[in-house]
Amino acid sequence: MSETFSDVEEMSILQSTKKKIGPTADYDAFDHDILVSINSTFATLFDVCGFGGDKPVRINGPEETWDTIITDPRLEWIKDYVFMKVKIAFDPPSNATLLENYNKQITELEWRIYTVLNDYYPDVH
């Protein structure tokens, strides 16, 4: 039995991010660029919110899964945060209003993630 894309989305950080920004799961020409953007986003989350513990989360390919880095359902916003940051870095909207909207959502998500980490994981900071 083969995996459906929704199965991959639930598991793979790279594949679910690719789905959100456009390329299909089997198209891998931009995987390296997308990985760089994902890892940069995790580094930002580490710097801004303390997410990742002692060091930023880093992925190397489609094997890394969301459930290995997000163990608390209150942190599910991290997925949306990664998708939006990668979208802006990889394929930014040409419409200034849309870009501003993305940036406002990103700022709100940073605050929400920081708040959860600060309230429930104070030793992280």
Stretches with model-predicted labels:
Residues 43, 58, 73, 82, ...:
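Alpha-helical protein-protein interaction elements
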